[in-house]
């Protein structure tokens, strides 16, 4: 197998990312890849976890501005990339991430409707040429996903947004996935078994292409 790669699982709330991540880990190990680090965003370092809390939690009496939210997310992302992901890849460890930059492009760019040029410039400034080698986008109808999320318990600040926010977010996800060959869309509304099969098929095909 060639050098270590960064793989990301993306999707709306309730899309089954945790289960998808486990399928990815199992598939990688079956392919003989055992040196694997896991990350989540926002978070993944002590400082980034503090920023995660600021983004996720309610702030009674003070509105968290959309731009503040966006900058916190990118600040946390830079901490994670520079202190965890890049060092792991350098050591030969594959990295499997629960969310990455695509989340901001979809949630803040799509859901919050922040200017696309600003989003691109911020991404380029913060991350430069760094990007995942392969991304699985778990696609689900927002109404279905939110029902699943509510079943897990109390919703966080972002999960409490109205349905139109998540519809815009999903639309941006789909647009981005369509324009980038490194992003594979998985229908997350299927049975657990079929979703797992689709993930394994997509991941194994990509791994085979790395051998060429």
UniProtKB/Swiss-Prot annotation:
Its EC number is 2.7.4.9. Coiled coil: none annotated. One of its GO terms (molecular function) is dTMP kinase activity. GO terms for cellular component: cytosol. The keyword Glycoprotein does not apply. InterPro entries: P-loop_NTPase (IPR027417), Thymidylate_kin-like_dom (IPR039430), Thymidylate_kin_CS (IPR018095), Thymidylate_kinase (IPR018094). This is Thymidylate kinase. One of its GO terms (biological process) is dTTP biosynthetic process. ATP binds at residues 11-18.
């Amino acid at each position: 197998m060639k050098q270590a790669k960064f793989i990301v699982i993306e999707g709306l709330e309730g899309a089954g990312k945790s289960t998808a991540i486990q399928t990815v880990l199992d598939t990688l190990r079956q392919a003989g890849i055992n040196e694997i680090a896991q990350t989540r965003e926002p978070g993944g370092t002590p400082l980034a976890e503090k920023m995660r809390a600021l983004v996720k939690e309610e702030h009674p009496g003070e509105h968290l501005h959309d731009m503040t939210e966006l900058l916190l997310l990118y600040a946390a992302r830079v901490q994670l990339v520079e202190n965890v992901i890049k060092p792991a890849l350098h050591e030969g460890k594959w990295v499997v991430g629960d969310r990455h930059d695509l989340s901001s492009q979809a949630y803040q760019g799509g859901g919050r409707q922040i200017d696309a040029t600003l989003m691109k410039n911020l991404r380029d400034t913060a991350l430069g040429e760094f990007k995942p080698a392969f991304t699985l986008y778990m696609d689900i109808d927002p109404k279905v996903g939110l029902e699943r999320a509510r079943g897990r318990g109390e919703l966080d600040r972002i999960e409490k947004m109205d349905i139109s926010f998540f519809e815009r977010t999903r639309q941006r996800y789909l647009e981005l996935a369509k324009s980038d060959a490194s992003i594979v869309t998985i229908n997350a509304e299927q049975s657990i078994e079929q979703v797992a099969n689709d993930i394994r098929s997509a991941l194994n095909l990509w791994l085979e292409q790395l051998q060429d």
